[in-house]
């Protein structure tokens, strides 16, 4: 049986993302999307083995090791992001991770795809996307 140290894998993903951001800001969005997808996947797998409480444990360790950016809420969003992306045919590189976070509360893929389309076409900022969603609902 192969044991994976999920915590070290998650920590390495996040450290590598920090390095990538410093080296080349151009690829930041793609790096963020890839990193947060991978972290979400690892969190889901770790949760299967160790229970859902692992997110809280990892958030405490990551906060101590890497800073306050990785609280339980943030890690839960990464896990939800992974679950959302799994359902999608393609991921738009035109949207930032923050755009996708605005769409996480929705389960209707038609609604999500609609907001992705208008965000791409109208080049909406995260704030503009949020306002558009609030106007419709």
Label for each model-derived stretch:
Residues 1-137:
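Basic, low-complexity intrinsically disordered segments
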